[in-house]
Design a protein with these regions (language model features):
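Substrate-recognition "cap/lid" segment bordering the active-site pocket of phosphatases
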Residues: 77-128, 137, 143
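General structural signal for secondary-structure boundaries
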Residues: 49, 55-56, 105-106, 113, ...
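Acidic, Mg2+-coordinating phosphoryl-transfer loop and its flanking beta/alpha structural elements
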Residues: 125-158
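Surface-exposed amphipathic alpha-helices with a cationic face
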Residues: 59-63, 118, 142
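Alpha-helical substrate-recognition element adjacent to the catalytic core
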Residues: 2-104
């Protein structure tokens, strides 16, 4: 295994994957948020998701032996999602996702999933970058691990 010089962490939806055709928001007393019922009703359409411009950087990082690539998504991954990852997106070195019934916040999910990497010797000197379209998640993860963040503007960052 090559020496790990870089750690690239990618959110999926709105960052490298365009799943907007099955995404919508609702507004309630707490503000605007993703309509999870609609999202779940349309999860079978994952193979119709598209790729966003940041995907080119993701593919470049996947081909770089000195870069360890992680996807950290708040999605519950089902068969169509995994098919999309395997056949279209390309599999990262590690994958963090929500399990069915998990209701913790996306930022907590991502922080807990990433914590072990920042304690491993292999990653101590790696230059880490987190690509995310949700400002709250981006700030929480970058502040927790003292890493660089790249905000990706999207309409899916709720």
């Amino acid at each position: 295994m090559a020496t790990i010089k870089r750690l690239a962490i990618y959110d999926m939806d709105g960052t490298i994957v365009d799943s907007s055709h099955r995404y919508r928001t609702i507004v309630d007393a707490n503000g605007e948020r993703i309509d999870l019922d609609y999202w779940r009703e349309n999860e079978y359409r994952a193979m119709q998701d598209g790729l966003l411009p940041m995907y080119e950087q993701y593919r470049s990082d996947l081909s770089d032996e000195s870069c360890y690539v992680i996807i950290a998504t708040a999605r519950v991954m089902n068969a169509p999602d995994w098919q999309f990852v395997k056949e279209i997106l390309g599999e990262p070195d590690y994958f963090i996702s929500r399990t069915e019934g998990d209701s913790q916040s996306g930022k907590t999910l991502k922080i807990n999933g990433l914590a072990k990497f920042f304690n491993l010797q292999n990653f101590k000197k790696a230059d880490a970058v987190f690509y995310e379209d949700n400002v709250s998640y981006l700030k929480a993860v970058c502040d927790r691990f003292n890493i660089r963040g790249v905000y990706i503007p999207s309409k899916q960052g709720h």
